[in-house]
């Protein structure tokens, strides 16, 4: 997702951005129908596109190029330095591709660059493992270091840098656990604690994460604000 603030993102610009995203997605051969969404808010607009889970860095580059290209075509005199700005930003961020694959504004070199980035980022081994997991209707969780299959006592985690072969996964030992998600503006932690107390009283061993910390069966694993995805993944694993 790309946040656009301080730019006149009118309907014409959004249409140009959307068309470029669609062409790039088609060029990359991403399966299915990607969602391409532009949502206006008080300070600007959010521009989002879905992508395969092993192509997310490429997707951010795609999204940024589509907007910059649309801006450049709308007013080349005002946005003439965009390419240099993108290259400088890539070098400053330490991007490994900045020297060999510098960002481009023109469509053909930009799409060729995205193809190379996508090929470098692709994880066919990870896709095969996820496909096998989903075919068995098991949940999976992924972060920068681990992929886990199953939840709770039925969960196993594997380093993303050394994935097992599908045939070597102990599928019969893996399973899901009942899971509840609590959302809202106020009272989430109180509600989660109340649910956990009810489950303990009923003889279950609930685990939960919240702004107080991580808890399993009434014991504190760690204190602090774990209301985000890290806390949820830790408990579910």
What is each of the regions a protein language model found here?
Residues 123-124, 190, 227-230:
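Residue-level recognition of alpha-helix initiation/capping sites
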Residues 172-175, 197-237:
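ATP-dependent carboxylate-amine ligase catalytic core
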Residues 1-179, 201-206, 211-212:
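Preference for protein termini
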Residues 178-195, 199:
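Glycine-rich phosphate-binding P-loop
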Residues 128, 132, 194-197, 234-235:
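Alpha-helical scaffold segments in soluble metabolic enzymes
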Residues 116-119, 185, 222-225:
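Hydrophobic alpha-helical scaffolding
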């Amino acid at each position: 997702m790309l946040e656009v603030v301080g730019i006149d993102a009118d309907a014409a610009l959004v249409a140009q951005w959307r068309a470029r995203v669609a062409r790039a997605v088609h060029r990359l051969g991403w399966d299915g129908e990607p969602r391409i969404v532009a949502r206006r808010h008080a300070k600007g607009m959010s521009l989002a596109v879905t992508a395969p889970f092993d192509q997310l860095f490429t997707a951010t580059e795609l999204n940024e190029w589509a907007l910059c290209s649309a801006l450049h075509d709308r007013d080349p005199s005002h946005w003439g330095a965009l390419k240099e700005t993108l290259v400088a930003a890539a070098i400053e961020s330490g991007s490994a591709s900045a020297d060999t694959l510098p960002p481009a504004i023109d469509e053909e070199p930009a799409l060729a660059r995205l193809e190379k980035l996508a090929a470098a980022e692709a994880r066919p081994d990870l896709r095969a493992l996820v496909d096998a997991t989903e075919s068995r209707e098991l949940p999976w969780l992924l972060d920068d270091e681990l992929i886990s299959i199953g939840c709770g006592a039925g969960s196993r985690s594997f380093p993303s840098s050394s994935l097992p072969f599908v045939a070597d996964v102990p599928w019969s030992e893996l399973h899901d656990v009942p899971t509840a998600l609590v959302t809202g503006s106020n009272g989430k932690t109180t509600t989660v604690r109340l649910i956990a107390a009810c489950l303990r009283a009923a003889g279950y061993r609930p685990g939960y994460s919240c702004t107080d910390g991580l808890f399993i069966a009434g014991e504190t694993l760690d204190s602090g604000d774990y209301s985000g995805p890290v806390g949820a993944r830790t408990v579910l694993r």
